Amino acid sequence: MKTLRILPFLVLLPFLSCSSSEDEPTPTPAETMYFPNNTDNNWETKSIASLGWNQSAVPPLKDFLAEKHSKSFMILVNGRIVMEEYFNGHSATATWPWNSTGKTLVSTTTGIAQQEGLLNINNKVSQYLGNGWTSEPLEKENLITPRHLLTMTSGLNDESNWVIKSNLTYLADAGTRWSYSNVFQKLIDVVAASSNQTFENYFNAKLKNKIGMDGFWNFGTIFTIYHSNTRSMARFGLLFLNKGKWKNEQIINETYLNEAISTSQDINPSYGYLWWLNGKSKYMVPGSQTVYPTALVPNAPADMYAAMGAEDQRIYVIPSKNMVVIRMGDASDPQNPNFALSGFDAALWDKINAVVR
């Protein structure tokens, strides 16, 4: 009798299982992150239509970019090119200066040197450059670490962009004052000294060649600026979107990367390790001690972080959308060029938001 009671239930099981499987929708697999090859120009694309974005808002975006003196513009989603546009005589093979956007290359190379045990960003800078690299009293100079250079809190006088010893005078104790200045360039010397080779050689071997970038450094008397094509800038943005990993190789460890794109001090919470951070309660800008009580770009995604350079060079990384946005070009407002943040950011995001939905 026990067998007779159990059998009908067992017979029903396959049908119940079948019915459940047919009623439930098949989950859509998450799209994998794509990485272009390092050896050719092939790069997968993805259409705006396939993303469900607003195609009719693309022409106004392109018109805006052209009118604002842009040279190039790219959007990547999961590493695939959704938009790639060139303007005002520029081309895919032409190089363009990154300006201060390249500070993030220095930050990243510094992090790689730390993960290789060549330096520690919490040690004294003088441990790598020797005593007397500034004109400060030794007890004040010894307060400065590479971390202070990464966070713009060295306390050194910021009146001159020319980073020579006579200009590096005391203004405040390290860590007590945020001020955007060129003294971050001393990180280039720290990496060179700790790696026992030129910064450029170390950068090429540990970062540039690993992710297939092109380009070169121009070490000028005052400014040190990286130049490359637009896709090389996009490759670097993609590396950060994928948390420092390129294909199967961890180029920069996640611990340092997360520090770099997080608030690094409480004076200007919108600043990491030479990266700008959106979604914070306040921010400061180059050349001013004014504190603005709002997010960096209020109409952009709150989780966005950005590399920002003079004349509106931009890398925007938006993890929540698996998206990287690149803009290279001349200043959007030639009469009022800015070193970093400008009104261009909010205006551009108005146009991007009309496309991305």
Which residue ranges define each predicted feature?
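Short active-site loop at a secondary-structure junction
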Residues: 64-74, 85-129, 142-144, 171-178, ...
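C-terminal/domain-terminus segments
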Residues: 326-357
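N-terminal leader/targeting segments and the immediately adjacent pre-domain N-terminus
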Residues: 16-91, 96, 114-119, 151, ...
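Short, well-ordered beta-strand elements
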Residues: 83, 321-330
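Sec-dependent bacterial lipoprotein signal peptides
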Residues: 1-16
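Penicillin-binding protein/beta-lactamase superfamily catalytic region
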Residues: 212-319, 333-342
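Active-site SXXK
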Residues: 79, 96-122, 149, 186-191, ...
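Active-site helix/loop module of the DD-peptidase/beta-lactamase fold
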Residues: 116-154, 195-229
